[in-house]
C-alpha cells in the first residue's frame, strides 16, 4: 500500500490504487478488541501477499471471515474456490502453506462469511476449509 504497487502503473487494470498510508498495519495473529468483541487476525498469504482472515466468537457463533482467500459457490455453497489468480503477488506455494496452517488451527467454525458467495452455517461452514483446500490442490499443480 505504501509503495503504491497497485497504482496507475499497475498491469492489473482492475486493481488501480493510489499510494496510501494505512491507519493500522495488521500483523500476524493480532487481536483487536471492540466493546468486548475480540477479533483475531491471521495473515494467509497466497491469493495476495496481504491476504488476511478474521476470526471472532459472536454470541454462540464461531465466525470466520475469509475475504477472497477462499469462498463457497454453487446454489447451496456446495463447492469452493480460491478465486482469481492474476494478482502480482499470487503464490500457490504460499497459499498451500496458508491452507495448511488454517486447517491445523482447528477453529471449528460454525459460520463462514467470505468476500463472495453465500454465508455458510453449521457443518457446511466446518467443512468449507477442507473443500477449498482440496480445490486449491487440484487446481494449482
Locations of regions flagged by a protein language model:
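Short, flexible loop segments at boundaries between secondary-structure elements
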Residues: 137-141
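Exposed alpha-helical structural elements
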Residues: 7, 127-128
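A charged helix-plus-loop insertion that forms the helical arch/lid used to bind
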Residues: 132
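Short acidic-hydrophobic, aromatic-tinged amphipathic segments that line or gate anion-handling sites
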Residues: 23-29
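Acidic/polar short surface loop at catalytic or gating sites that assists cofactor/ion binding
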Residues: 1-21
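Metallo-beta-lactamase
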Residues: 15-20, 31, 38-45, 49-127, ...
